[in-house]
């Protein structure tokens, strides 16, 4: 292979690696901004949303625990 072909292959590999890293970072930023509805309800201290948005069991219990430990008038 000539030098130009080798350089082109190296450039393609580096470009695809950077594109993959950018896509992963973008995906994690979007997930961090949206979060799940149960978590958002807890952060916003909406007890009724814990009942309507969270599934039975651990999710709902965690939502209530967050509210009771961090949100007025419980604090």
Swiss-Prot record:
Q: Which domain of life is it from?
A: Eukaryota
Stretches assigned to coiled coil: none
GO cellular-component terms in the record? extracellular region; plasma membrane
- Record's SUPFAM superfamilies? Protozoan pheromone proteins
The keyword Endoplasmic reticulum belongs to this UniProt entry's keyword annotation: no
TM region positions: none
Name the InterPro entries for this protein: Pheromone_Er1_protoz, Pheromone_protoz, Pheromone_protoz_sf
Q: Does the keyword field hold Amino-acid biosynthesis? A: no
What are the record keywords, sorted?
A: Cell membrane, Disulfide bond, Membrane, Pheromone, Secreted, Signal
- Propeptide positions, renumbered to this chain? 20-35
Tell me where the signal peptide lies: 1-19
Cystine pairs: 38-54, 45-71, 50-63
**What are this entry's molecular-function GO terms?**
pheromone activity
Subunit and interaction comment: Homodimer.
Its annotated function is as follows: Mating ciliate pheromones (or gamones) are diffusible extracellular communication signals that distinguish different intraspecific classes of cells commonly referred to as 'mating types'. They prepare the latter for conjugation by changing their cell surface properties. The membrane-bound form promotes inter-cellular communication and adhesion for mating pair formation and may act as binding site for the secreted form.
Name it. Answer: Mating pheromone Er-1/Er-3
The major lineage groups are:
Eukaryota, Sar, Alveolata, Ciliophora, Intramacronucleata
- Name of the coding gene: MAT1
